[in-house]
């Protein structure tokens, strides 16, 4: 299938599955444990039904908006995805260029294949950088400094990866640093000639932000030992304060999927949060993000900008997220499929599909401005939204109390005697009417 035949993100996924080696395709297209949350993320979007409106002027539509003050052509950004450069040679550079040309933010992962400096050299506009807080805080501070030097305009701090969840496909595929491919995966590589040729033509085949920037980490073998020991289980809200002291730009907190955590994040003064469950790759059994969005919006929507990721596969999904209160969204797998399918052109195709689907959905819902989309566009929102947004019934108005009757004035004695006599006569007549007729005795 060629790009001109592609009609949705799932078509790009099919092409990527054919072109990308199994161990790297499975890395992107998998979840933790039973993958229940991974599946729920997309299923929850499908359960939301929209109101179809007709006979409304839907000319001159606009899907452009802003994210933390940055103009964007559609309400989405490319999410940080580790090892993007293994989906396609120099993958981060291809994705960043596509995002820049399309007018949406690109977020580079700490665990990228291409380094911060390489992506900055290949692009002309600021991109965003995602940070994992490592045990080696000196290295974390160095990463922040490098992001500043590269002109990154926002820092995305990931909070939900203090410890790595088990992803069965990665274990079975031997995906590690260095990789330990199985015989089956080696055979699979033989059937991916275009990918193999492309990887031979680039020098970027390791974690570019780490190798050569950490003392003692000079190759894939030493990288594996260092990486396994660096994810920090002690990361807490005080650590976020530490990050803020080192980063004086826009700060986005990623991985919030609980109301109480959202409240804490808002109090810390971050510019935005991303309602996220890491695409179902961390806590299997966690709630779908679109289900958690309404109560989080209700709790802190007036205090902080709210974005959402996990489960978005179409422009209609973006529309539903906006209708439920998100300012914007992040896409991960949706752009990774495009990247694996056709590099920069594939990412551009993914963004074009999302924009077209978003625009058509908005039009058929009777709206012309994405910034005006809201709860009024939903017919059957998630149960969590119904609890939050449905107006509470007003208490029924009580009937006005009747005024107490004033006590009657005392009647003179003569009047009393006449009244008593009249009552006595009336009683006799009533008794006479009620007296049954006499019956004859049966023989």
Regions found by a protein language model. Give the residues of each.
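Glycine-rich active-site/cofactor-binding loop and its immediate structural neighborhood
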Residues: 72-111, 116
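Alpha/beta enzyme core
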Residues: 83, 97, 118, 122, ...
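Alpha/beta catalytic cores of nucleotide-metabolism and tRNA/nucleoside-modifying enzymes
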Residues: 1-46, 291-309, 313-398
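Short, conserved glycine- and acidic-residue-centered signature motifs
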Residues: 92, 286-289, 347
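Intrinsically disordered, polybasic Lys/Arg-rich low-complexity tracts
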Residues: 392-443
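An N-cap/entry alpha-helix motif that binds or orients negatively charged groups
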Residues: 1-69, 174, 178-235, 372-392
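Short, conserved beta-strand segments within well-ordered enzyme catalytic domains
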Residues: 49, 64-66, 75-79, 105-109, ...
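A gly/proline- and charged-residue-enriched helix-loop-helix capping module
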Residues: 101-122, 126-140
């Amino acid at each position: 299938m060629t790009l001109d035949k592609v009609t949705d993100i799932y078509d790009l996924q099919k092409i990527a599955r054919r072109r990308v080696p199994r161990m790297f395709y499975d890395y992107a297209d998998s979840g933790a444990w039973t993958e229940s949350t991974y599946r729920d993320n997309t299923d929850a979007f499908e359960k939301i039904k929209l109101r179809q409106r007709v006979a409304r002027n839907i000319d001159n539509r606009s899907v452009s908006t802003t994210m933390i003050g940055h103009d964007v052509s559609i309400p989405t950004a490319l999410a940080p995805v580790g090892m993007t450069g293994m989906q396609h040679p120099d993958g981060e550079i291809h994705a960043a260029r596509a995002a820049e040309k399309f007018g949406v933010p690109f977020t580079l992962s700490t665990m990228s294949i291409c380094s911060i400096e390489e992506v900055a050299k290949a692009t002309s506009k600021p991109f965003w950088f995602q940070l994992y807080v490592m045990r080696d805080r000196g290295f974390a501070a160095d990463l922040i400094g490098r992001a500043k030097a590269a002109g990154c305009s926002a820092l995305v701090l990931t909070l939900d990866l203090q410890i790595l969840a088990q992803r069965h496909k990665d274990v079975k595929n031997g995906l590690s640093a260095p990789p330990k491919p199985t015989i089956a995966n080696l055979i699979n590589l033989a059937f991916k000639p275009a990918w193999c040729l492309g990887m031979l033509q680039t020098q970027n085949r390791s974690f570019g932000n780490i190798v050569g920037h950490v003392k003692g980490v000079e190759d894939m073998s030493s990288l594996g030992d260092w990486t396994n020991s660096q994810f920090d289980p002690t990361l807490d809200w005080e650590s976020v304060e530490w990050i803020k002291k080192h980063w004086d730009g826009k700060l986005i907190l990623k991985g919030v999927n609980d109301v109480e955590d959202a409240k804490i994040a808002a109090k810390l003064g971050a510019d935005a949060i991303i309602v996220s469950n890491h695409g179902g790759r961390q806590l299997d059994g966690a709630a779908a993000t679109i289900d958690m969005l309404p109560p989080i919006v209700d709790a802190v929507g007036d205090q902080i900008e709210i974005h959402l990721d996990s489960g978005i596969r179409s422009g209609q999904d973006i529309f539903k997220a906006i209708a439920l209160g998100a300012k914007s969204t992040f896409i991960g797998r949706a752009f990774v499929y495009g990247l694996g399918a056709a590099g920069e052109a594939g990412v551009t195709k993914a963004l074009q599909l999302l924009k077209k689907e978003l625009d058509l959905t908005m039009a058929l819902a009777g709206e012309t401005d994405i910034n005006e989309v809201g709860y009024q566009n939903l017919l059957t929102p998630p149960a969590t939204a119904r609890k939050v947004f449905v107006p509470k019934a007003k208490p029924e108005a009580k009937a006005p109390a009747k005024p107490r009757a004033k006590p009657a004035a005392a009647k003179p004695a003569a009047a009393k005697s006449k009244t008593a006599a009249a009552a006595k006569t009336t009683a006799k007549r009533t008794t006479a009417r009620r007296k049954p007729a006499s019956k004859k005795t049966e023989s």
